[in-house]
Amino acid sequence: MMSTSDAPLDPVEFIHSRIRTVPDWPQPGVMFRDITPLLQSAKALRVLVDLFVERYVDANLDYIAGLDARGFIIAPIVAYELSVGFVPIRKVGKLPYATQRESYALEYGTATVEIHEDACKPGDRVVIVDDLIATGGTMMAGKNLLERLGAVVVEGAAIVDLPDLGGSALLREAGLPLYTVTEFPGH
C-alpha cells in the first residue's frame, strides 16, 4: 500500500493536478471536471483511495454508498479497503429488487434515484461517495434515501467540490458534514 506521503506533491495538490478541465462540455459555458486522467494513473488512484481510507478507517462504518454513476468508481474501492459493504444508489429503473425512490430538481426538470429497500438497516453508519458536488441534488437525494431506511449518514464525500454552484453549502445547511479532496471555481 502506497502512503500518501509517497506522492510527488502534497496529496491534495497531486489529485487536483490529475483532474482535466474540458471547456464547453457537455454544453457551452460549462467547465467539465474530468476525473478520467486521475483514474488512469495507478499512483493517483492509490493516493485518492488512501485519502478516503485514512479519513474513515476509524469511523466505525457499516457501508460506503456510491452515487450513480461516477460514485460507483471510487466507492466500492474504498469500501473494500475499509472491509465494509457497498450500497449502490442508482438512477431509477436500474435496481432489480424492491426500492425506495427520491426525486430531486435539475436545472430543467427532475431526476430520480433509488436504493434497494433492504440496502441497510436502522443504525447502520454510512458515508455517501460521489465524484463531484455541484448543486448537491444527487447527494441530498442519497442522504434522504439512506435516512428513510434508518441509516446514520456520517458524511458525504467527493473528489471535487464546485462551491460556486452552491451544492456543498446546501448540503451542510441540511446537516450533512462533507469531505471533498479538492475544489474548482466556477461551473
From Swiss-Prot:
Keywords: Cytoplasm, Glycosyltransferase, Purine salvage, Transferase. SUPFAM superfamilies: PRTase-like. Pathway: Purine metabolism; AMP biosynthesis via salvage pathway; AMP from adenine: step 1/1. The keyword Disulfide bond does not apply. CDD domains: PRTases_typeI. It is an enzyme of class 2 (transferase). Disulfide bonds: none annotated. It is found in: Cytoplasm. It catalyses: AMP + diphosphate = 5-phospho-alpha-D-ribose 1-diphosphate + adenine. GO terms for molecular function: adenine binding; adenine phosphoribosyltransferase activity; AMP binding. GO terms for cellular component: cytoplasm. Its EC number is 2.4.2.7. One of its GO terms (biological process) is purine ribonucleoside salvage. Belongs to the purine/pyrimidine phosphoribosyltransferase family. Homodimer. Catalyzes a salvage reaction resulting in the formation of AMP, that is energically less costly than de novo synthesis. PANTHER family: ADENINE PHOSPHORIBOSYLTRANSFERASE. This is Adenine phosphoribosyltransferase. It comes from Burkholderia pseudomallei (strain 668).
